[in-house]
Design a protein with these regions (language model features):
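Flexible C-terminal active-site loop/helix
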Residues: 1-12, 23, 36, 289-353
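Metal- or metallocofactor-binding catalytic centers and their adjacent structured scaffolds
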Residues: 5, 33-35, 39-110
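Short, P/G- and charge-enriched loop/turn segments at secondary-structure junctions
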Residues: 15-20
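Conserved, mostly hydrophobic/aromatic
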Residues: 31, 37, 99, 112, ...
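Hydrophobic faces of well-ordered beta-strands that scaffold small-molecule active sites
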Residues: 40-42, 127-133, 154-158, 184-188, ...
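Predominant activation on well-ordered alpha-helical scaffold segments within soluble catalytic domains
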Residues: 58, 62-65, 96, 100, ...
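Metal-dependent enolase-superfamily TIM-barrel catalytic cores that perform enediolate-based chemistry
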Residues: 117-231
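Shared catalytic-loop signature of beta/alpha-barrel
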Residues: 208, 219-226, 230-234, 241-331
């Protein structure tokens, strides 16, 4: 197997402000793995939060790509990955996820089967995805919500964590008025103290918010579990639910966990998490970070397994260089093309390697 890299810049349609940062663009590193005339693709994106800049991603992906030479094919490399034998233990989960995605794309193309079929799901998953509204004025949030509802979005996620919590309340109130039938999710990205969260959550419940992600700062899962026990609306762990061990500690103690493939290490890591929470009362949310359709595609093939799908990262881009998972009408769809089912924009189905 032979690997190659390409780094591109992904611009957002408009800056996305959350409680800890504002983002207008990020770099994506595309990994291609070629074997016997077939090529698989995966994507890793930069993240200041996880300490991953483009140079580090390029170095780590190049090292993983060079190491592929010891495997006879993608199937054996995937077996080693699933067994935890490869890549090395200190490889960041985002890098492991990108390598796994390229291998799964390659394996699926070699088998002539889409990823969801390789994972045992016969029907191509289709799911209503949340669409994110960042920290912005109530008027702008309302205009965005109105447009999203008109486009078919049934689920809207509102970012919170303003310096004045009343601004968050007013933003959610404006979104609720503009999209009265929408299901609302709230995400402060850990901005509140337990006391502030305890005071605010009943108010958001009164506005019909369906669930809140990571209301308090990560690092104290006991406090998060205690808040969930008394919260009037479901609490979903995100930054406190990174690894399988994190999730096991929280299973049955929070209402949901947000699994992002770049955070946990990829498709098979996500499946292990889903298995760990089964029957515990803790439900699965599939989330993402802002990326292209190539980066989102592996999660879309898992979307039928989740209570909540928040797979809109590609929809935040001014130009998505890949296509194949939908989402513009509020629903993401896994395709029936072999592998991940995506292709570079402007390339026909017949030309996909």
């Amino acid at each position: 197997m032979k690997a190659g890299l390409r780094t591109v810049r992904l611009e957002l349609t408009e800056p996305l402000r959350i409680s800890r940062s504002t983002m207008s663009a990020r770099e994506a590193v595309w990994l291609s793995i070629a074997h016997e005339g077939v090529t698989g693709h995966g994507e890793a994106v930069t993240s200041a939060y996880y300490g991953l800049d483009a140079a580090r991603l390029e170095r780590l992906l190049a090292a993983a790509g060079a190491d592929l030479a010891r495997f006879p094919g993608p199937e054996s490399a995937l077996g080693a990955l699933r067994a935890g034998e490869w890549p090395v233990d200190d490889t960041p989960p985002a890098v492991t996820a990108a390598v796994e995605a390229a291998l799964l794309d390659l394996a699926g193309k070699r088998a002539g089967r889409p990823l969801h079929r390789l994972l045992g799901t016969s029907e191509a998953p289709v799911a209503a995805t949340a669409r994110t509204i960042g920290i912005t004025s109530p008027a702008h949030a309302a205009a965005q919500a109105r447009a999203l509802a008109a486009s078919g979005f049934e689920v809207i996620k509102v970012k919170a964590g303003s310096s004045d919590p009343e601004d968050d309340v007013e933003r959610v109130r404006a979104v609720r008025a503009a999209a009265p039938r929408a299901r609302l999710l709230l995400d402060p990205n850990g901005a509140w103290s337990p006391a502030v969260a305890g005071a605010l959550l009943p108010r958001f419940a009164g506005l019909g918010v369906e669930a809140v992600e990571q209301p308090i700062a990560p690092g104290d899962p006991e406090a998060l579990a205690a808040l969930a026990a008394r919260s009037p609306l479901p609490v979903v762990a995100d930054e406190d639910a990174v690894s399988l061990e994190d999730v096991r500690r929280l299973a049955g103690r929070v209402h949901g966990v947000n699994v992002k493939l770049a955070k946990c290490g990829g498709v098979h890591a996500a499946l292990r998490i889903a298995e760990a929470i089964e029957g515990s009362g803790t439900e699965l949310m599939l989330g993402c970070i802002t990326a292209s359709s190539l980066g989102l595609a592996p999660a879309v093939h898992l979307a039928g397994r989740a209570r909540w799908a928040d797979l809109d990262g590609h929809l935040l881009l001014a130009h998505d260089p890949w296509t194949g998972i939908g989402g513009e009408d509020g629903r993401v769809r896994a395709g029936e093309l072999p592998g991940l089912g995506v292709r570079p924009r402007g390339v026909s189905r017949e030309d996909v390697a």
